[in-house]
Amino acid sequence: MTSADQPDPDRLLAIYLQDHRAGAAAGVALAQRCARSNEGTPLGDVLAEIAREIDEDREALDDIMGRLDVSESQLKSLGARAGELVGRVKTNGVLTGYSPSSRVVELEGLIAGVSGKRQLWASLSATASTRSELDEAELRALFARATSQIERLEAEHHRAAVTAFSGAGTAL
């Protein structure tokens, strides 16, 4: 294989970042919606804090993309937002309102999204030594924050699952 046959690493990175940026937009929307759905509860307080952090992480990604001269893909962001909206339509055993099973599924979605974001920070950190635009200390801090978000979301998911599926839990 010749060097002409090799994919351009800058182009691959741009596509990768655009994909994650689209996911970040959907993640912010999901986190904010979950926080609103649980407002006035201890879970709502945790979700409001995590939603704020996820939005800050999206802003950090925007800054990184700017330093790398990568623009957001409007089409990908629109598609991710549409997917988040479609995800709201589900059978949850409740005709109107918010079901305890909805809470479990939404927390699982947040955990999956934050896990993907954590891997983004790990991937960028792995390449920071070859790209002066990337700040390894910043990426380590973002990775640590994603890990903290996952831990808090998993704890809330456990409580939500107990409440929804065993009836043994307390109000969230």
Give residue spans per PLM region.
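Preference for long, well-ordered alpha-helical segments
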Residues: 110-172
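Alpha-helical transition-metal enzyme core signature, strongest for iron centers
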Residues: 17-31, 47-61, 82-89, 110-117, ...
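Actinobacteria-biased recognition of intrinsically disordered, low-complexity terminal regions
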Residues: 1-7, 171-172
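Alpha-helical bundle segments that constitute or directly flank the non-heme di-iron/ferroxidase center
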Residues: 6-39, 105-128
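Carboxylate-rich helix-loop segments that flank metal/cofactor sites and access channels
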Residues: 68-100
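Amphipathic, non-membrane alpha-helical segments in soluble helical-bundle scaffolds
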Residues: 10-21, 44-51, 72-79, 100-114, ...
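Inter-helical turn/loop segments and adjacent helix faces that build the functional surface
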Residues: 33-45, 68-69, 123-140
